[in-house]
Curated annotation (Swiss-Prot):
This is Peptide methionine sulfoxide reductase MsrB. It is an enzyme of class 1 (oxidoreductase). It comes from Vibrio parahaemolyticus serotype O3:K6 (strain RIMD 2210633). InterPro entries: Met_Sox_Rdtase_MsrB, Met_Sox_Rdtase_MsrB_dom, Mss4-like_sf. Belongs to the MsrB Met sulfoxide reductase family. It comes from the Bacteria. GO terms for cellular component: cytoplasm. Zn(2+) binds at C62, C65, C111, C114. Residues 1-25 are annotated as: Disordered. Residues 1-11 have a biased composition (Basic and acidic residues).
Length: 147
């Protein structure tokens, strides 16, 4: 069983900008699957996400509000079935919450700007940080670098 990252639950507004919309507004903006995962804390099936095997250079941003969350330099293949990163873009990008669902104790990660569910963070990552940010592909959009 993966070790759980014990981070102090926090809410940090990214660049002082917080995105707030009603469920109705989110439903108009997002696909059914995006809404289920991002707004209702769902999970996409493992090995099904379009960004799982993406190896291009760029920034992974929030599907809901386009806030930058992760960079390609921090992405790695953990074998878990979801895109994995060893660190977020910065400490202000992510909100951490205790998740007691499904009979487990985990640390949920959300976008700090719009509170979108991203996935979970575990302490079984690579030696660089020891952390694995396990993220649903549907929670992310990829912005390719011009390089």
């Amino acid at each position: 069983m993966p070790k759980i990252v014990k981070k102090e639950p926090k809410f940090v507004e990214q660049s002082g900008k917080k995105v707030t919309k009603s469920d109705e507004q989110w439903r108009e903006q997002l696909s059914d699957e995006e809404f289920r995962v991002c707004r209702e804390q769902g999970t996409e099936p493992p090995f099904s996400g379009k960004l799982l095997h993406n190896k291009e250079t760029g920034v992974y941003a929030c599907t809901c509000c386009n806030a930058p969350l992760f960079i390609s330099d921090n992405k790695y293949d953990s074998g878990c079935g979801w895109p994995s990163f060893d660190a977020p873009l910065n400490n202000e990008a992510i909100r951490y919450l205790e998740d007691l669902s499904h009979g487990m104790v985990r640390t949920e990660i959300r976008c700090a700007s719009c509170d979108s569910h991203l996935g979970h963070v575990f302490e079984d990552g690579p030696k660089t940080t020891g952390e694995r940010y396990c993220v649903n592909s549907v929670s992310l959009i990829f912005n390719k670098s011009d390089e």
